[in-house]
Design a protein with these regions (language model features):
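Short, surface-exposed, low-complexity cationic segments
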Residues: 133-164, 168-170
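Acidic, serine/threonine- and proline-rich low-complexity intrinsically disordered segments
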Residues: 1-117, 159-214
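Amphipathic alpha-helical packing elements
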Residues: 111-143, 147
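A generic structural micro-environment signature
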Residues: 125-128, 133-137, 149, 153, ...
Length: 214
């Protein structure tokens, strides 16, 4: 009986891998948690040269010639039989198994260490970092935030040397400005935006030099 169950598990893993090879990783259950991790892993890989694959698909830990990124869809499809089956149990494909497999294969501990999911701003406020893909395909660390919550912040934080992109919102959460240069924003676009905001929300504090109190 145990041998039959093991064979069924092996057949299931083979079928899943074949489906991925034929139709891509979209065949796998990717929830928000998995998508967010994959974006962070790709950001990490983009900004470190010690995390690539060579022609035979093996991982290399030194700077050298590489053909495709380890976290790319192309490589994940190519190597699916290596990273996915060890995490499949039974005959049900669960998102947690896919997440765990990717986390192990893409060295999630290093991703967590270098590409945080949250950040503390200079004014002491905790913010969630998103890793959004821009139109040109570049992944940027991004914070969507009401503009008053960055009052008292004058230097743009960075992740692996990349400035965080701020999507600034009005108190009603309407888009105001997008910037990755806070110092330039305060001296440039802010005076005109502030004038408009004061007219719409006269009871709010608009002194950007002082951090907003909770």
């Amino acid at each position: 009986a145990e041998r039959r169950v093991a064979a069924q598990d092996e057949d299931f893993a083979y079928a899943v891998c074949r489906a991925v090879e034929k139709n891509g990783i979209a065949r796998l259950p990717f929830g928000e948690k998995t998508k967010a991790f994959l974006a962070r892993a790709r950001f990490y890989e983009t900004h470190t040269r010690a995390f690539r694959t060579v022609d035979d698909g093996s991982a290399v830990s030194v700077v050298g010639t590489y053909t495709i990124a380890k976290s790319s869809e192309e490589n994940l499809i190519k190597t699916v039989r290596e990273w996915l089956p060890p995490f499949l149990t039974g005959t049900t494909l669960r998102e947690n198994a896919v997440y765990d497999a990717l986390y192990y294969y893409l060295d999630g501990a290093k991703v967590d260490k270098n590409v945080p999911q949250t950040i503390v701003l200079a004014n002491g406020k905790f913010c969630t970092l998103l890793y959004d893909t821009a139109a040109e395909g570049i992944i940027r660390p991004t914070i969507e935030i009401i503009v008053q919550k960055i009052f008292g912040c004058f230097e743009t934080p960075r992740v692996m040397g990349v400035p965080v992109l701020f999507k600034l919102l009005s108190p009603a959460r309407r888009p105001l400005q997008i910037t990755d240069d806070l110092a330039g924003f305060w001296s440039g676009a802010w005076p005109e935006i502030c004038k408009e905001m004061k007219g719409r929300y006269p009871k709010h504090n608009w002194d950007y030099r002082a951090a907003e109190r909770e």
